[in-house]
Regions:
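Short, well-ordered strand-loop elements centered on a beta-strand within folded domains, enriched
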Residues: 1, 104-128, 170-176, 208, ...
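Rossmann-like S-adenosyl-L-methionine
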Residues: 182-468
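Internal alpha/beta scaffold segment
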Residues: 130-215
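Nucleotide donor/acceptor-binding cores
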Residues: 93, 172, 294-295
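Flexible glycine-/small-residue-rich
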Residues: 99, 127, 176-178, 265, ...
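Short strand-loop junctions, especially beta-strand C-caps/beta-turns
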Residues: 40-42, 139, 177-179, 266-270
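Extended interfacial segments that mediate partner engagement and assembly in macromolecular machines
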Residues: 1-163, 167-169
Length: 468
């Protein structure tokens, strides 16, 4: 239970579980409860205390570290800086909306002197484990640049999903996933007109629209599984995409001290969603892992290269970085970013050996083992491991252990996965030597953890007693 002193009003009546359907309908026109802000009624300080206890418990129960370990007793979930709001709002630079049908009473709104349609299609989101999306009036966690667009006012007939992005430079990219039963050209024309009416000259507002047909299975759109967070469509080949007004990628910039890194990230590509997360994670990686000039490093589950760029800058012209990523969209970004003239190379990494590999991490670790044995790459010094919420698995960790790196930095968005994999690494002879956690998802139950592992000292063998 949440102590009364730690309670606070939720961020909007759509997120208030204590409000009645009638109260929500009267305030927003939408009676349903919106998910995604399950900690919104708890003070931020209490949220971080809860998350600290969760990380400690998972590392203890699943990873085997004793609760009295200084790594756990000294752990505090750290707050990330927020530019626009200090209540844990307006931090999401990436938001995926589902589109849901909303029935209205004819004539309850006026548009150009005509009665509004009885049915409109609005942006929505899935409540926790719900099969149907709920219309969104305002999503308080979204960045202000996205909230100010008021996407809920668009009639998105023919659209299945909307992916909204705002870059560190303030450019907005809206990707519309179009139902294959509709003409993508007609849908694009209609939405572009609505956007121009609502926002004026899109180029001046730095807004780009991008339309993609949804893939189908047996002629029907693929459906989203209840409770699933995975995208129910695959990306179609570039030739089958329709580009709307503007670009289909954004430029992200990350600074840490005097270092500045640039990245090109496509629509649908992966990037950290908290505005302050990229700089925080790069700084944390550099201070914990301490990559040195001339070292050989691995960046596993590398995405567009957030850590790859910083690693390459640190190891310099005499060092090596191997990046492995499975997503075709994100891998394509990484290949472009780290081409000889790629935007993610710095003056210090202009001549760094950077290998960008697409595919399954566990499988390619076998290839790296072979490359090591034949002297094709130098001995591996440091590894960044940043898997998805499911974490790495025993096979991946055993193959990584076989490469015999000196240190491993594990970045985890699920403390249970980190706890499980900590237990596996300890079995393989690794010690956790540093642990930090960050409130990268305020007003939700999610938390980011970063752990540094080093090879445990070899234990002396017990001396056998001599027998006569």
């Amino acid at each position: 239970p949440v102590p009364s002193l730690a309670r606070r009003p939720p961020p909007g009546i759509q997120a208030d579980a204590l409000a009645t359907d009638e109260e929500r309908a009267a305030a927003t026109g939408v009676p349903e409860l919106l998910g995604g802000m399950e900690y919104g009624h708890i003070s931020l300080a209490e949220q971080r205390r809860y998350k600290t206890d969760i990380v400690r418990t998972q590392i203890n129960r699943l990873g085997g570290l004793p609760l009295e370990s200084p790594l756990l007793t000294n752990l505090i979930v750290e707050e990330l800086p927020l530019r626009d709001n200090n209540e844990g709002l307006s931090w999401r630079t990436r938001v995926r909306y589902n589109v849901t049908k909303v029935r209205t009473q004819p004539g309850d709104q006026k548009s150009g002197g005509k009665k509004s349609p009885a049915v409109t299609w609005r942006v929505g989101m899935h409540p926790y484990r719900a099969s149907q999306p709920v219309p969104v009036v305002d999503f308080p966690l979204a960045a202000l640049e996205l909230r100010n667009l008021e996407l809920e006012k668009l009639n998105l007939r023919g659209v299945r999903e909307v992916e909204a992005t705002v870059s560190s430079r303030g450019r907005v990219l809206l990707q519309f996933i179009v139902d294959p039963r509709f003409s993508i050209e007609e849908v694009a024309k209609d939405i572009e007109q609505q956007a121009a009416d609502a926002w004026g000259l899109l180029a001046k507002r730095k807004i780009s629209l991008f339309f993609t047909p949804q893939s189908t299975s047996n002629g029907k759109p693929k459906r989203r599984r209840p409770g699933s967070s995975h995208t129910p469509y695959r990306r179609v080949p570039e030739g089958d995409q329709l580009l709307g007004a503007g670009l289909r990628s954004v430029t992200e910039e990350v600074t840490f001290g005097s270092r500045r890194f640039s990245y090109q990230v496509s629509a649908g590509g992966f990037w950290q969603i908290h505005r302050a997360a990229p700089s925080t994670m790069v700084g944390t990686m550099l201070t914990m892992l301490r990559p040195q000039e001339g070292e050989c490093t691995l960046d596993l589950y590398a995405g567009a290269g957030l850590f790859t760029a910083a690693l390459a800058d640190a190891v310099g012209a005499t060092g090596t970085v191997v990046s492995i990523e499975g997503s075709p969209v994100t891998h394509k970004d990484a290949r472009s970013n780290f081409a000889p003239d790629g935007c993610s190379r710095t003056e210090n990494s202009a001549n760094t050996r950077i290998e960008v590999i697409r595919g399954d991490v566990a499988r390619h670790l076998v290839d790296l083992k072979t490359a090591l044995e034949f002297g094709e790459i130098p001995a591996i010094d440091a590894v960044v491991l940043d898997p998805s919420r499911e974490g790495a698995n025993r096979t991946t960790l055993e193959r990584l252990d076989a490469l015999d790196p000196k240190r491993i930095l594990y970045v985890a968005c699920d403390p249970a996965s980190l706890g499980r994999d900590t237990g596996i690494l300890r079995e393989l002879g690794w010690d956790m030597v540093q642990l930090r956690a960050f409130d990268m998802y305020p007003n939700t139950h999610h938390v980011e953890s970063v752990a540094l592992f080093e090879r445990a000292p070899a234990k002396p063998r017990p001396r056998r007693r001599r027998t006569k």
